[in-house]
């Protein structure tokens, strides 16, 4: 029963987090929800970890978003919708190759502090990208100078209602996390944001909301593998696959040591490959192990991969029956939920 409850809470909290990371990867927000169904269920089937959770996460999303920028492809465009699944497919191919080469043992030679520094850098980049959204503008892109320039430009035309809503949301999240860490404040705040959009003139105040999402499941199709030059695909997909392997295996082994069990590193690579393959076939960005979601499952005393299966099945039901609320979610609230998720993954 605890696994079921933990799975449903993970699903609910994953809604804003996954949507935010999907946008960072250059996809419409709903693709974050698509990536929270079949990929995590398939990972649960193949994984030897009883508790680790797969999902749309910071590092792969940021790397894919950066790659799109380097290719001159606008995030959210039709071209991005075609290119991202191609990159995800080749990430899955690399992860399968790592499995066949028994490359899981290589993670023992990766410095945890170096990997931690790399992830911290990605999280900081994501935070800087999202600051303009807190001020009422659009997300930033590019390197540090471009990000800072966009923040300053947005600050010149700041929308104070957006900023106030964001700061209040962030203060509530951080306070509740400190005094009542088990309380699912992210879920409550998301619901409260939707209610505020209904009862208050958010649009008149200049507070942006997410685009409405029609109910339904993702379309399954094989990506157009000839869409990009092979050398470009190999470079981007290999870097993402290495990050997924290193970050997720290091985190999985940390949880395993903490809780007194062992995982099969090579079998985990097969699970990563399977999850990313189905992500590619449903148009999603690469999927990664999530420290924040796993810690949440542990916090609610989840013990088995039933958590992942329940989370994925619950998200499937939501996509079929209940996506109407998404168009009422205020962007500043979503941004703050993303900030706290970044902090959890960095920690």
Regions found by a protein language model. Name each.
Residues 342-347:
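A short, hydrophobic C-terminal helix/tail in secreted or cell-surface proteins
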Residues 1-341:
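Transmembrane helical cores of multi-pass ion-transport proteins
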């Amino acid at each position: 029963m605890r696994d079921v409850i933990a799975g449903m809470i993970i699903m609910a909290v994953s809604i804003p987090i996954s949507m935010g990371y999907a946008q960072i990867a250059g996809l419409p927000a709903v693709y974050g929800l698509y990536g929270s169904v079949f990929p995590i269920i398939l990972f649960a089937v193949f994984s030897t970890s009883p508790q680790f959770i797969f999902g749309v996460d910071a590092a792969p999303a940021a790397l894919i978003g950066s790659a799109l920028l380097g290719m001159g492809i606008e995030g959210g465009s039709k071209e991005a919708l075609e290119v991202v699944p191609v990159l995800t497919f080749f990430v899955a191919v690399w992860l399968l190759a790592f499995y066949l080469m028994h490359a899981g043992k290589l993670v023992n030679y990766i410095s945890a502090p170096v990997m931690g520094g790399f992830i911290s850098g990605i999280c900081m980049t994501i935070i800087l990208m999202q600051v303009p959204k807190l001020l009422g503008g659009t997300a930033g892109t590019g390197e540090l100078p471009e990000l800072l320039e966009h923040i300053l430009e947005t600050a010149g035309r700041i929308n104070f209602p957006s900023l106030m809503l964001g700061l209040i949301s962030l203060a509530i999240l951080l306070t509740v996390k400190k005094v009542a860490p088990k309380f699912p404040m992210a879920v409550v705040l998301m619901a409260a944001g939707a209610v505020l959009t209904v009862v208050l003139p958010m649009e008149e105040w200049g507070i942006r909301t997410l685009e409405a999402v029609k109910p339904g499941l993702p379309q399954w199709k094989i990506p157009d593998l000839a869409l990009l030059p092979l050398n470009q695909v190999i470079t981007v997909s290999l870097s993402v696959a290495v990050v997924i392997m290193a970050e997720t295996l290091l985190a999985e082994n940390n949880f395993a040591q903490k809780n007194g069990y062992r995982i099969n590193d090579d079998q985990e690579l097969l699970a990563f490959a399977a999850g990313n393959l189905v992500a590619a076939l449903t148009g999603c960005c690469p999927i990664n192990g999530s420290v924040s979601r796993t810690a949440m499952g542990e916090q609610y005393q989840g013990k088995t991969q039933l958590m992942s299966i329940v989370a994925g099945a619950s998200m499937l039901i939501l996509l079929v029956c209940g996506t109407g609320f998404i168009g009422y979610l205020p962007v500043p609230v979503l941004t703050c939920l993303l900030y706290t998720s970044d902090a959890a993954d960095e920690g």
